[in-house]
């Protein structure tokens, strides 16, 4: 479960029957990406608003879509992708602390879309599932459990 400021990883045994290990990482979250990009933008005297950073992250695969001056585009593109790769590396290290060779990986949380490709590549033998509506999946599942009784 990758959120803004935290990553929670659980290892579940059997047929999703029992949690065997859980670990929370309070310094791994999407804020890593936003902070890295913000520092770069500030050093280049560019817009550091969250809305602008969100635009850059959303368009990180298409350099031409970045709303930035042509002479700054390459640097911004590289900074954005470097920040995302930093997050991906930290998440992979954290997950392997809990489970080195998972059979299934369920991606939950608003930051899941930033790590999905790297998780699929690193855990290539695992079945990687991006849950529907990952940002709200956990809260919706809790609500469903409470109100279905």
Residue positions per predicted region:
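Conserved acidic E/D residue at the C-terminus of a beta-strand in Rossmann-like folds
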Residues: 1, 24, 132-133
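Gly/Thr-rich phosphate-binding beta-strand-loop-beta motif of the actin/hexokinase/Hsp70
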Residues: 1-16, 37
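Aspartyl protease active-site motif detector
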Residues: 3, 27, 31
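Helical "lid/coupling" subdomains associated with nucleotide-phosphate turnover
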Residues: 11, 32-46, 50-149
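Short helix/strand-bridging catalytic loops that position acidic/His residues to coordinate divalent metals
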Residues: 15-28, 125-128
């Amino acid at each position: 479960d990758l959120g803004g400021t935290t990553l929670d990883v659980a290892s579940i045994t059997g047929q999703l029957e029992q949690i065997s290990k859980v670990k929370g990482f309070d310094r791994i979250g999407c804020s890593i990406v936003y902070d890295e990009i913000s520092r770069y933008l500030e050093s280049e005297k560019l817009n550091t608003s969250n809305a602008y950073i969100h635009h850059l992250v959303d368009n990180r695969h298409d350099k031409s879509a970045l709303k930035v001056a042509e002479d700054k585009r390459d640097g911004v593109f590289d900074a954005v992708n470097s920040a995302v790769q930093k997050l991906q590396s930290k998440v992979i290290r954290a997950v392997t602390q809990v489970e080195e060779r998972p059979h299934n990986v369920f991606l939950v949380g608003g930051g899941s879309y930033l790590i999905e490709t790297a998780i699929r590549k690193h855990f290539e033998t695992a079945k990687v599932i991006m849950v529907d509506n990952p940002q709200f999946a956990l809260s919706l599942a809790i609500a469903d459990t409470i109100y279905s009784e």
